């Protein structure tokens, strides 16, 4: 039988390559006569490291270049950290598969000087590094006595900056730390009561051409249904709020008693205004669950908070 060749577009960061290699290995292991190759490239978000992500804008910061490769026929699929994939995709492309989720929580990483502290008892004035407005807003709301500084670069670069003393601690996704072999650096898993995670955090999203039935069939073997249901609800929530990957919107989802329970949060940049609510709905209609939760938050003032944030972004 003739081998079927599949090309993956990927970011070239260490974490992106670890994730893409996992997808490659799983596909080749499960599908006979499949040859998978990888084309790695830098995205806009990888190149601009001296500006806070929120100031650049978030329309495909880490995805546009990969999508362009698929649209011109140079790649068949793109592997993304699902949290980086916008909810509205270019014409001709679709989210073809969502893989089994790693721990979606945020994690506290400290240097040796601060390994006796947890987030809740860090001394006043401790410097916390994060590039996420979502984490920033929630932690400012909970711990106004801490100092928050923007930190850019890949996971390894951020840990190096922490160990060099530029920060007392940093906040990173637990999933990325585990995938890179840095699980031992997780000092504390931050509970969802303190920080709701990003939409799609911990899961991989595989994007492909909407009409490529062969590729859709191939990647379907990696689909994890419970993860897919949860993440589709989270993405519908974000889409309904017309938010993006870089705004203070957080979620937590779980499946219980054959129902989908989604918690969502919208906060102001300073953390002083924070709206949080929950919606429980049909597990087989995750999009509706996300939309209904978004409507509940809108009724409580979420749109006003987000419009103020977008106005500030436009002024910068």
From Swiss-Prot:
GO biological process, alphabetically ordered: chlorophyll biosynthetic process; protoporphyrinogen IX biosynthetic process
NCBIfam families reported in the protein's UniProt record: hemC
InterPro entries assigned to the protein according to its UniProt record, in alphabetical order: HemC, Porphobilin_deaminase_cofac_BS, Porphobilin_deaminase_N, Porphobilinogen_deaminase_C, Porphobilinogen_deaminase_C_sf
E.C. designation(s): 2.5.1.61
GO cellular component terms given for this protein: cytoplasm
Molecular function terms, GO-annotated: hydroxymethylbilane synthase activity
Transmembrane parts of this sequence: none
Its biological purpose: Tetrapolymerization of the monopyrrole PBG into the hydroxymethylbilane pre-uroporphyrinogen in several discrete steps.
Top EC class of this enzyme: transferase
Listed SUPFAM superfamilies: Periplasmic binding protein-like II, Porphobilinogen deaminase (hydroxymethylbilane synthase), C-terminal domain
Pathway per the UniProt entry: Porphyrin-containing compound metabolism; protoporphyrin-IX biosynthesis; coproporphyrinogen-III from 5-aminolevulinate: step 2/4; Porphyrin-containing compound metabolism; chlorophyll biosynthesis
PANTHER family according to UniProt: PORPHOBILINOGEN DEAMINASE
Protein name per the record: Porphobilinogen deaminase
Name of a matching Pfam family: Porphobil_deam
Residues where S-(dipyrrolylmethanemethyl)cysteine is found: 245
PROSITE patterns: PORPHOBILINOGEN_DEAM
Reaction equations catalysed: 4 porphobilinogen + H2O = hydroxymethylbilane + 4 NH4(+)
Similarity comment: Belongs to the HMBS family.
Domain of life, per lineage: Bacteria
Swiss-Prot/TrEMBL cofactor(s): dipyrromethane
Oligomer status and interactors: Monomer.
């Amino acid at each position: 039988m003739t081998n079927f060749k599949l090309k993956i577009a990927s970011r070239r960061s260490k974490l992106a390559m670890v994730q893409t290699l996992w997808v490659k290995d799983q596909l080749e292991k499960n599908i006979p006569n499949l040859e998978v190759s990888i084309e790695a490239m830098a995205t806009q978000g990888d190149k601009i490291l001296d500006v806070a992500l929120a100031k650049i804008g978030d329309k495909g910061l880490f995805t546009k270049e990969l999508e362009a490769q698929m649209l011109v026929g140079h790649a068949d699929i793109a592997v993304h950290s699902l949290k980086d994939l916008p909810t509205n995709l270019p014409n001709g492309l679709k989210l073809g598969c969502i893989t089994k989720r790693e721990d979606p929580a945020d994690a506290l990483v400290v240097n040796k000087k601060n390994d006796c502290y947890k987030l809740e008892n860090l001394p006043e004035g401790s410097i916390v590094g994060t590039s996420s407005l979502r984490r920033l807003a929630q932690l400012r709301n909970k711990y106004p006595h801490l100092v928050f500084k923007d930190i850019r670069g890949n996971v390894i670069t951020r840990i190096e900056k922490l160990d060099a003393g530029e920060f007392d601690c940093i906040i990173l996704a637990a999933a990325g730390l585990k995938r890179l072999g840095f699980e031992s650096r997780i000092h504390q898993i931050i509970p969802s009561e303190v920080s709701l995670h990003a939409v799609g955090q911990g899961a991989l999203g595989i994007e492909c051409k909407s009409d490529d039935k062969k590729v859709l069939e191939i990647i379907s073997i990696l689909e994890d249904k419970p993860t897919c249901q949860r993440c589709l609800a989270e993405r519908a929530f974000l889409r309904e709020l017309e938010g993006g990957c870089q705004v203070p919107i957080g979620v937590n989802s779980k499946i219980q008693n054959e129902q989908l329970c989604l918690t969502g949060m919208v906060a102001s940049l300073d953390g002083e205004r924070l709206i949080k609510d929950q919606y429980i709905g049909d597990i087989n209609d995750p999009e509706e669950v996300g939309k209904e939760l978004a409507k509940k938050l809108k009724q409580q003032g979420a749109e006003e908070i987000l419009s103020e944030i977008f106005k500030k972004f436009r002024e910068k």
